[in-house]
């Protein structure tokens, strides 16, 4: 395979960078079985600690005493990447595995006071794939004919420390000081680092060991109970400026004079500003409805919101655009012990078709989320929760350019996602 084509194949099949686990831009669509079953909606509808600590810290004033939530999410994707270059056609599929994302949330309010506190350890996103080398494959043949084995792993955790205050019987305000931990590894790293041999073949170094990066970003929110049946809420999550991910690596060209010599690799991947707003409705004694909107500003964010496309022979990753999301969920108290929930979430696709090569990472094609779940009160102090969701396959189809930016084919990225969550809520 020519170096030009091998490079393009690599970029199309390996740039499955971090956000791939997410079902809504770079994040999961909801956190915990309650919030997830409601389609991620609830910025104006107090329910439990995980949704409050993720989307609106003002909601923790709804706690009566201590409330602790434990949750685990299981999800599995289905990546397909189809490339067409002249008469050559290829399909790449990942070694899809069930992934696990945990979450813990706590909130406390003295019923006689107005101050509430919250703390969490929340998995926001996670991704892992492993494509084996295959001598018979156009895509994954060993170097220099293909690109060999391809591996990626990304995890992001949010650690919120929240405080909220009930200003009046109707109005609560809250703030969360959020610490974010990102962990990222990719082998090889298909970015601006590479070695050339005499024939012009590119050899990319590995960044396979998980690199850790930290960010700090505050979050602000309010909740207003306009009437017994209507409430409104909103929150603002400020941008997350992670330090660049860094790896100790070596030069990869076996024929080069510096083969095996050390080099340091870096990749800058930050998080966006997010504005959420919503309406909470209680049309009946046992019925609760949440309707939310969310704006995620990816444009200009390092790593995610760059220009995209081929620039000076290097593909800029992602090139995502700003995204609007609509969420809605319904909760029905069926019996004294049983609650059922259903939800829907629609998110615009952050990928731009004109630079789809840059945005390769099929999970970003997710748009429609169908969700449902239930809760059961086992004891006065304990509720068990479960939910499921399905995101049908969506496609992003765009040009397949060469390193000079000339279109030589097409690229079709698609994915689907299936998930299930279980959890427990303790109140005491």
Positions of predicted regions on the chain:
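Bacterial N-terminal signal peptides that target proteins for export
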Residues: 1-9
């Amino acid at each position: 395979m020519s170096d030009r084509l091998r490079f393009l194949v690599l970029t199309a099949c390996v740039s499955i960078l971090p956000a791939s686990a997410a079902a809504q831009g770079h994040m999961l669509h909801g956190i915990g079985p309650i919030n997830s079953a409601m389609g991620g909606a609830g910025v104006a509808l107090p329910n439990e600690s995980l949704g409050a600590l993720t989307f609106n810290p003002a909601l923790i004033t709804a706690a009566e005493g201590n409330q602790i939530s434990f949750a685990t999410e299981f999800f599995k994707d289905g990546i397909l990447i189809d490339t067409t270059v002249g008469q050559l056609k290829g399909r790449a599929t990942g070694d899809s595995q069930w992934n696990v994302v945990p979450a813990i949330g706590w909130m406390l309010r003295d019923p006689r006071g107005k101050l509430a506190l919250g703390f969490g350890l929340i998995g926001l996103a996670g991704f892992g794939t492993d494509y084996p080398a295959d001598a018979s494959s156009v895509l994954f043949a060993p170097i220099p004919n293909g690109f060999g084995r391809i591996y990626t792993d990304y995890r992001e955790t949010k650690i919120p420390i929240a405080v909220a205050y009930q200003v009046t019987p109707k109005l609560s305000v809250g703030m969360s000081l959020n610490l974010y931990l990102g962990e990222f590894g990719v082998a090889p790293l298909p970015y601006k680092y590479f070695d050339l041999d005499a024939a012009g073949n590119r050899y990319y170094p590995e960044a396979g060991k998980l690199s850790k990066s930290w960010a700090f970003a505050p979050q602000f929110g309010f909740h207003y109970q306009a009437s017994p049946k209507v409430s409104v809420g909103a929150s603002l999550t400020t941008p997350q400026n992670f330090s660049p991910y860094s790896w100790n690596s070596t030069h990869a060209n076996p024929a080069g004079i510096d083969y095996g010599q050390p080099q340091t690799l870096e990749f800058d991947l930050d998080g966006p500003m997010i504005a959420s707003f919503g309406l909470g409705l209680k049309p009946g004694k046992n019925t609760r409805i949440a309707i939310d909107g969310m704006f995620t500003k990816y444009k200009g964010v390092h790593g995610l919101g760059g220009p995209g496309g081929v620039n000076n022979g290097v593909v800029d990753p992602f090139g995502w655009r700003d995204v609007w999301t609509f969420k809605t969920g319904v909760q029905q108290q069926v019996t004294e012990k049983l609650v059922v929930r259903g939800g829907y979430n629609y998110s615009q696709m952050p990928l731009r078709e004109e630079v789809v090569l840059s945005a390769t990472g099929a999970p970003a094609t997710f748009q429609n989320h169908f969700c449902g779940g239930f809760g059961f009160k086992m004891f006065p102090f304990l509720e068990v929760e479960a939910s499921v969701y399905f995101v049908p396959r969506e496609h992003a189809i765009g040009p397949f350019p060469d390193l000079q930016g000339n279109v030589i084919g097409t690229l079709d990225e698609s994915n689907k996602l299936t998930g299930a969550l279980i959890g427990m809520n303790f109140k005491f």
